[in-house]
């Protein structure tokens, strides 16, 4: 079992390009097991591209990604998912025409028995109580916030060691934002490591252990979450939308 003091995920010298634009430039950071770490910065700073690079989703990228000490470079996204690294993009990718339960079933890697599948869905429903009474509902008939929770729940079906979340509170009603951040704290308590990209700086830092700030594709600052929460100068300089 990995020590909480050793990195679960390490990024070394990450670079990424869109056409000729060098969007992520020589980024290096780590996330330890059991942490919530937030990537912060203005729009266009390179946060989402960093997540996509970690998942092997960009054709033009370089650098090393280590997960549990093992290199991931050269492996496609599905292999990284099998290794225990999950990713929920901002667009959610909920499958229309399927129920909440059927969407959850898509998150299972193996081929469990019906009883095992039902048991896992019941476990997930306890962690995501808003979905519990909606399992038979057509998934895209739910609100955007509920669909976001479904996307996260689906990623959690395979019991990943770590999950990458891209702007989970974007466009969601405040009451659901509160519920979502309570959910992230609950997931951490259950042993899930989280790397979070989030524009809601105050809420993200309130549940995070540490944060890295990106500006123009580079990490320009890192600190404990509480120190950053108290540093209004850094927030206004790098994190205002």
Residue ranges and their predicted role:
Residues 40-42:
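The feature captures the beta-strand-to-loop junction immediately N-terminal to the Walker
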Residues 63-72, 83, 117-121, 223:
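Conserved ABC transporter NBD signature motif
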Residues 159:
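Conserved catalytic motifs of ABC-family nucleotide-binding domains
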Residues 19, 60, 75, 100-119, ...:
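ABC-type ATPase nucleotide-binding domains, specifically the catalytic core motifs of the NBD
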Residues 155-156:
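ABC ATPase C-loop
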Residues 55:
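Helix-to-loop junction immediately C-terminal to a conserved catalytic motif
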């Amino acid at each position: 079992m990995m020590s909480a003091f050793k990195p679960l995920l390490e990024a070394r010298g990450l670079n990424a390009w869109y056409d000729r634009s060098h969007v992520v430039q020589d980024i290096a950071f780590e996330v330890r097991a059991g942490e919530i770490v937030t990537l912060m910065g203005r729009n266009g700073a390179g946060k989402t591209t960093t997540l996509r690079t970690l998942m092997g989703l960009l054709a033009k990228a370089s650098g090393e990604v280590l997960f549990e000490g093992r290199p991931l470079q050269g492996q496609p996204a599905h292999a990284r998912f099998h290794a225990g690294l999950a990713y929920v993009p901002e667009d959610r990718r909920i499958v229309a025409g399927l129920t909440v339960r059927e969407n959850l079933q898509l998150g299972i890697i193996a081929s469990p028995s019906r009883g095992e599948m039902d048991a896992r869905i019941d476990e997930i429903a306890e962690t995501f109580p808003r979905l519990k009474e909606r399992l038979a509902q057509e998934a895209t008939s739910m609100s955007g916030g509920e669909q976001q929770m479904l996307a996260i729940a689906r990623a959690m079906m395979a019991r990943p060691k770590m999950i990458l979340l891209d702007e989970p509170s974007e466009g969601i009603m405040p009451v659901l934002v509160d519920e979502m951040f309570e959910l992230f704290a609950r997931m951490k308590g259950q042993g899930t490591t989280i790397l979070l990209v989030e524009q809601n700086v105050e809420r993200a830092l309130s549940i995070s252990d540490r944060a890295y700030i990106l500006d123009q594709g580079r990490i320009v600052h890192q600190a404990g979450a509480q120190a950053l929460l108290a540093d209004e100068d850094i927030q206004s300089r790098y994190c205002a939308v």
